[in-house]
Design a protein with these regions (language model features):
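Flexible, glycine/small-residue-enriched loop-and-beta-strand segment within the central core
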Residues: 64, 79-192, 224-225, 232-233
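C-terminal/domain-terminus segments
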Residues: 197-222
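Conserved beta-strand positions that form and line the central face of beta-propeller blades
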Residues: 62, 84, 209, 220, ...
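Terminal amphipathic alpha-helical/low-complexity segments used for targeting or macromolecular assembly
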Residues: 1-56, 145, 151-152, 156-164, ...
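Short secondary-structure boundary/capping segments
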Residues: 49, 75, 170, 177, ...
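Short coil-to-beta microelement around the adenine-binding A-loop and adjacent beta1/P-loop entry
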Residues: 70, 177-178, 196
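Well-ordered beta-strand segments characteristic of repetitive beta-sheet solenoids
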Residues: 57-58, 76-77, 221
Length: 240
């Protein structure tokens, strides 16, 4: 029973994801049925929140979305349970096809009503891990096929602290923005600060703090602050 159900669901999942997706036949039927019920409920929530949209996200239980008009999603987008998305911003929040926002993750684009933030643009097939924070006031862009671990934080805003006679909170903020290229892997509990420009194919080690600067493609970066540890290279058979 479970193997047959896994085969059937694999076909549906492959069609929905536009790629081969094979479910482990050892997973019990009860577990698979629970997943199916949960996914159907997420689809229904998305339909209720965005009844007139051609593409609607699947929305988990207790997820909250503010400024829905500023949220644009592609096909097959999932917003996990307990996630919080406040899309109020100049460019809005744009989530590409088959992108996932993990459980408990917060996306906030505007820190003050005095000035709208820039927003968040995410490519296709991107995984934003669970329990993470994306502060997008200065703009955050993430390329296709990037995976971002759990408990990661992005902060695209800096406080001005040049004067000693004025409280820091009254000196204003600066925004340089953050860019993460395509095909990157950002490890769990990493912190990415305003002004960081991470090239395609990079790996950021767990717990690293990525400060403002340019990080060339295919580098492996780690530490506090993050520095180049090594450069990824094609294996001999691929290079040939």
């Amino acid at each position: 029973m479970s193997a047959r159900l896994a085969t059937v669901l694999s076909r549906f999942a492959s069609r929905a994801k536009d790629e081969s997706y094979l479910i482990d036949e050892g997973i019990g039927a009860g577990y698979l049925l629970h997943v199916v019920v949960e996914r159907v409920a997420m689809k229904v929530r998305g339909l209720a929140l965005f009844p007139s949209r051609p593409a609607r996200p699947s929305v988990g239980a207790r997820a909250r979305i503010r400024s829905k008009g500023d949220l644009v999603v592609g096909r097959g987008v999932t917003i996990g349970s307990d996630a919080y998305v406040d899309a109020l911003s100049v460019d809005g929040v744009r989530l590409g096809d088959h992108t996932t926002v993990g459980r408990g993750t917060r996306i906030e684009c505007t820190g003050s009503l005095r000035q709208r933030g820039r927003g968040l643009t995410v490519g296709r097939r991107v995984g934003l891990g669970t329990d993470s924070f994306y502060g997008c006031a200065g703009g955050v862009t993430i390329g296709d096929d990037t995976i971002i671990g759990n408990f990661v934080s992005f902060h695209s805003e800096n406080h001005v602290a040049d004067r000693l006679d004025v409280p820091i909170r009254d000196q204003g903020v600066t925004h340089a923005g953050i860019r993460v290229g395509a095909g990157c892997w950002i490890g769990a509990k990493a912190t990415v600060l305003d002004g960081a420009q991470i090239g395609d194919g990079c790996i950021v080690a767990a717990g690293a703090v990525v400060t403002a600067g340019t990080y060339p493609p295919n580098g492996i970066y780690g530490g506090v602050p993050a520095r180049l540890l090594k450069t990824r290279a094609a294996s001999p058979e691929v290079a040939e």
